[in-house]
Amino acid sequence: MIERLKIAKNRLEAMNSFNFPAQDRHERAPLLGSEYDHSMARQLSLLNVVGMTKSVLMSSYFNLMLVFVPIGLIAGWFEWNAKSVFILNMLAIIPLASLLSFATEQLSIISGPTLGALLNASFGNAIELIVGVLALKRGELRIVQSSLLGSILSNLLLVFGMCLVTTGIRREITTFNITVAQTMIAMLALSTATILIPATFHYSLPDNANSENALLHVSRGTAVIVLIVYVLLLVFQLKTHKHVCHDPSEVEEETEPRILGLRSSIAMLAIVTVFVSLCADYLVGSIDQLVEEVNISKTFVGLVILPVVGNAAEHVTAIVVSYRGQMDLALGVAIGSSIQIALFLAPFLVIVGWIISQPLTLYFESLETVILFVSVFLVNYLIQDGATHWLEGVQLLALYAIVVLAFFYYPQ
């Protein structure tokens, strides 16, 4: 037994003389390596998050305005005066809208062309949807209607007019897809009809409770029909006539580089939506006191201020692509957005109001109805030949200026 112990001792001394690690050190070596690997993985993950955050923040100059997000939330939480709450949260929504568009674009790149186009169509007017739902919950039906109409007019007249002027700076005549233009003309006509018919129906009935109830039923029935048409429009654009409605060269040239993964895009979309909802809630909640302090009408706030601010990032995009000569893209952003609001967002909010017992209708005041009809008529006339120039853009901008002037003096 003693001899065996001596032999084992000699072997251990021999191993140590050749710098072989002892058994206990050998067993600890993999554990130390594992801890090192985990530490490196955490550092790489942190660097990856920092890199993605930097890329997201540098994706648009509008992100410099993100500083207004916490300030706007603080102003709303501590109930500052209405003007401060409204202005700060209005400024906060601008970069949030840009981030929402960025997250949607990243998700669409991952999802593929068809599903990506559907995502862009669904989230294209997310700001108007969020503001509309929050205003609807508060019973601010006038804000909902005026913001919908204002978004349509700002896209048709202001944005499309600026696109025509911008592209006219570099080109004498600009052409675009005549098939897409004709389809949009038909959809704009249907959009106008969904507002003209309820207005005419209202004026043809006596002013009593039964008439209001009948108008509500007509609006809700119209909303269901129009939503079906909108779904069929998506099928037309994304499936059956995809080759006609989309220019592959323009889509390829305008595709953004992929920065975020699937989970990162979804997480960013969810987080930004939450912040938009918070800022929009404070924004809508301050309107009643704001119109009393500043002495302007709710119609002007909803029809002019909210649409321009909420779509600022999208408006800039349309102007930039039109300057590059990509008028089909500009047409899709400007007029396509108006069609989406009229055929999807407005009827969808009517259905939401139906569900939560808010009597939102598609009936607009006579001045608003006439202005929409004139605007759609002018745009239809300008795009029906598939070519345009800068003077036509000036005409659209002039009409928008007249509309703003009229609603500035519109009584409360």
From Swiss-Prot:
One of its GO terms (cellular component) is endoplasmic reticulum. Keywords: Calcium, Calcium transport, Endoplasmic reticulum, Ion transport, Manganese, Membrane, Metal-binding, Transmembrane, Transmembrane helix, Transport, Vacuole. It comes from the Eukaryota. The keyword RNA-binding does not apply. Signal peptide: none annotated. GO terms for biological process: calcium ion import into vacuole; calcium ion transmembrane transport; intracellular calcium ion homeostasis. InterPro entries: CaH_exchang (IPR004713), CAX-like (IPR004798), NaCa_Exmemb (IPR004837), NCX_ion-bd_dom_sf (IPR044880). Gene3D superfamilies: NCX, central ion-binding region (1.20.1420.30). This is Vacuolar calcium ion transporter. The gene is vcx1.
